[in-house]
Amino acid sequence: MINPSINTPKSWLAFELNILHRFEFKSIALPFTGNPALGNYLKRGDVRVMANDPLQSAWTRALATIQNNGEKLSDDQVNAVLEDVYVPRHKLLNPALRTWFSETDSWWFDNIKQNLERLQTPLAYAMAASLAMSVGDYVLSFNEHTRELRQPLSNVFRRLWNALPEPVNNGQNNTCQNKNINEFIAELNGIDLMFLRLPATGGVRYDDSDKAAWREEWLRGGNDFWEEFEISRNGKLGAPVETKSQYLRLLEETLRTASHIKKWAIAHVDSGFVSTQDIAEVIGKINRVEAVYTKDFSELTGMKAVIITA
C-alpha cells in the first residue's frame, strides 16, 4: 500500500507560512493536502483555497475545515453519532479495524462509521468523521504501559468537538477534491499559486504503524481497496519508484501539467534520495527558478525542509 502524499511535521507549518507570506496571491491550489492546517490558515487571509488529496481520509479532513465556511456540529448531531456506539452487533462490518484496535475499540469505530450516515450534510459528515479520526489517533498514541491513562472514547470525541475552533469564513468558494494529482492540476483555472508538497521519495509504503493507513481503512470500510488504489497511482507522482530518474520523470510530467499556473512553490524533504538540486533542475526545464528556501530540522526530525519557488 503506497503512501501518495507527505505529512510534514507540525513545526514546518510556520516555515511554509513564512515563505508563502512573501508573495501576493488571492488563490492557491494544494494538490497534496495531507494535513489541512495550511489551507485553513491561508483562509484567514481571505485566500481562496483549492485543495485535493488522493486519500479519502485526507480529503474528508480538508472538507471539514477548508471547504467549510460556517457549518458546525450541533448537540443533536453529536448525540446521534455517539448513540449506542459500544453496543456490539452480530459481527463487525469492518473487520480490518481489528488490525489496529482492540475488540471493544473496534466496535466503537464500527458503530461510529454507521452512525455517520444519519447526518444530513456532507460537511457534517466530514466534521464528525474528522473527530473520529482524531479519536483513533488518540487511541494509537498509547502503548501497553500507558493504556490505563486513556479516557473513554466517547468522552474524547466530545472534548475534541467542544475544542473545535470556529469555522473560518473567508467569503470564498473554497473547494476540496479527491482526485489523482495530474487530473486535479489539469482542471485548475485562474489560480495564482500552486503549493505542491512533493510526496515521499523512494516509494514509501504504509505499514501497521502508519496512522494514515488506519484512517483510510476505517473510512472506506475495509482494506480490500488497496490494490485498486495502487493501480490508480501507477505512473503518477506519488507512486512507488525504484530509481531517482523515475521519480524525477514523474515530477516533470506533473509540473508540465501545471504549466498554466502562474506561480509555483514546491516543498521538498531533503532525504538524500533526490537532492534539492535535482528537483530545481527539473523545475527549471519548465519554469524559471526564483529562490530556494531551506530550514534545518535535523535535530528534531533528521530532515531538512526545502521550498523552491518558480
Located regions from the model:
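SAM-dependent nucleic-acid methyltransferase catalytic core
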Residues: 12-13, 18, 100-211, 220-237
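Conserved SAM/SAH-binding beta-strand->alpha-helix loop
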Residues: 55
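Short, conserved SAM-binding/catalytic segment
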Residues: 63-77, 160-171
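Conserved phosphoryl-transfer catalytic core
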Residues: 65-118
